[in-house]
């Protein structure tokens, strides 16, 4: 009953309120699929039939590969998988108090995450390394994650460049024939204010 209420509320948001989509190609894709699109406002409203048709195309289950096959993560059929939070900006220590995260902090959290058996994934950005320019962070994070953990990896899909770089690195690790196309998307501001 609670799941159904959540589903219905989600459908109402997608149909009645809609989402901001700030990419022309994304607007094209949704419009071609039959969604209501306002290009001037960069806004899309998704009919529940369209949403459910897309959801029906998703596989019922899949395996998220890890560098160590013993750490592959099965997704689906009521399997539970835990991942760490991502995008944390600050670290706190007894010695230095609260401060912006660094690449060294990221490496330390990655090592800690690797040792936690109850966490199945290595997070995409366990801590934001503020000592690295934002445009380069993914290029510093992912190689370190590949080197410091053999768990299944996640990387941010914040735009085409980051996603393409992550897929390229994944193919170097898993082989050219791999299809590393899984990403968790979240939108903290679906109605962004102007």
Where are these regions (language model features)?
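Acidic/polar, glycine-rich intrinsically disordered N-terminal extensions of enzymes
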Residues: 1-105
């Amino acid at each position: 009953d609670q799941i159904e209420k959540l589903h219905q509320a989600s459908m109402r948001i997608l149909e009645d309120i809609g989402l901001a989509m700030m990419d022309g190609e994304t607007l094209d894709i949704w419009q071609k699929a039959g969604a209501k699109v306002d290009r001037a406002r960069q806004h899309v409203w998704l009919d529940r039939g369209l949403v459910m048709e897309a959801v029906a195309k998703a596989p019922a289950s899949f395996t998220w590969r890890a560098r160590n096959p013993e750490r592959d993560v099965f997704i689906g059929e009521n399997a539970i998988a835990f991942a760490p939070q991502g995008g944390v900006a600050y670290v706190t220590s007894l010695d230095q108090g609260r401060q912006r995260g660094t690449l060294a902090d990221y490496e330390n959290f990655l090592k800690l995450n690797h040792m936690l058996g109850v966490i199945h994934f290595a997070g995409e950005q366990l801590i934001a390394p503020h000592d690295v320019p934002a445009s380069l962070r993914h290029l510093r994070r992912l190689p370190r994650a590949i080197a410091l953990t053999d768990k299944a990896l996640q990387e941010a899909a914040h735009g085409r460049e980051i996603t393409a770089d992550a897929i390229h690195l994944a193919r170097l690790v898993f082989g050219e024939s791999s299809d590393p196309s899984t990403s968790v998307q979240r939108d903290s501001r679906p109605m962004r204010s102007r």
